[in-house]
A protein has these predicted regions:
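Class I S-adenosyl-L-methionine
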Residues: 1-67, 157, 161, 169-170, ...
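General beta-strand structural signal in soluble alpha/beta enzymes
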Residues: 8, 43-45, 71-74, 91, ...
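Short gly/pro/ser/thr-enriched loop/turn and capping motifs at secondary-structure boundaries
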Residues: 14, 76-79, 127, 151-153
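Flexible, glycine/proline-enriched loop segments at strand-loop-helix junctions
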Residues: 17, 45-46, 68, 95-96, ...
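Conserved active-site and cofactor/substrate-binding residues in soluble primary-metabolism enzymes
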Residues: 19-26, 53, 76, 103, ...
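Short, basic, helix/turn surface patches
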Residues: 35, 93-107, 151-153, 168-176
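A contiguous loop/helix-start segment that scaffolds small-molecule binding in enzyme catalytic cores
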Residues: 41, 112-176
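Class I SAM-dependent methyltransferase SAM-binding "motif I" and its flanking Rossmann-like core
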Residues: 50-111, 162
Length: 176
């Protein structure tokens, strides 16, 4: 795609819901300008468009405004990361769950009681707390960290509780 045709749309990751919604609305309006001009628009995302993607909010807004839009699946970051770590996410009759860490340790503990294997997305700022919980359960060695997969600063390896992790950090906790 020629550079003059590429438009970057940045989203805020603010904890302020009003700011996030305003940013998403502005993104939808920007896209609508091009669609109204008869142009085709593609919006690549990091990971898969259907798994915790900010685009899904823009997608809903475009549909609400009457535009015909389509989501095309990508490779979820936890699948790409598991491949890079050379581990399967599940085997045989195992089950797995995917949750955000944003709701706290209680949700993580409940999910661990239900699923054989667990994927925790956006865990970067909560790694130490999850590590302490895993250590109390004797499972700290069963966690793999996947951070910035495919981007600068990529890390795929064991959970290191004293390491700094960014927003795009996922943890896979394998069964015993």
């Amino acid at each position: 795609v020629p550079e003059e045709k590429v438009r970057r749309i940045l989203f805020t990751m603010s904890k302020d819901k009003t700011k996030r919604e305003a940013c998403r609305q502005a993104a939808a309006e920007e896209i609508m300008k091009y669609l109204d001009a008869g142009q085709s628009v593609a919006m690549p995302v990091l990971g898969d468009v259907g798994i915790y993607s900010t685009y899904s909010y823009v997608h809903k807004q475009l549909i609400k405004e009457g535009y015909e839009v389509q989501m095309i699946s990508g490779i979820p970051s936890f699948c790409a990361g598991a491949s890079k770590a050379n581990i399967p996410i599940v085997e045989g009759n195992e089950g797995f769950g995917v949750i955000p860490s944003l709701k706290g340790l209680e949700q993580v503990e409940k999910a661990m009681d239900v699923f054989d294997n667990l994927v925790i997305m956006k865990v970067g700022s909560h790694v130490k707390e999850v590590y302490e919980m895993l250590k109390a359960k004797g499972r700290e060695d069963h966690a793999i960290i996947i951070s910035n997969v495919g981007m600068e600063g990529e890390y795929v390896g064991p959970l290191l509780p004293d390491r700094e992790y960014g927003y795009f950090t996922t943890m896979i906790i394998k069964s015993l």
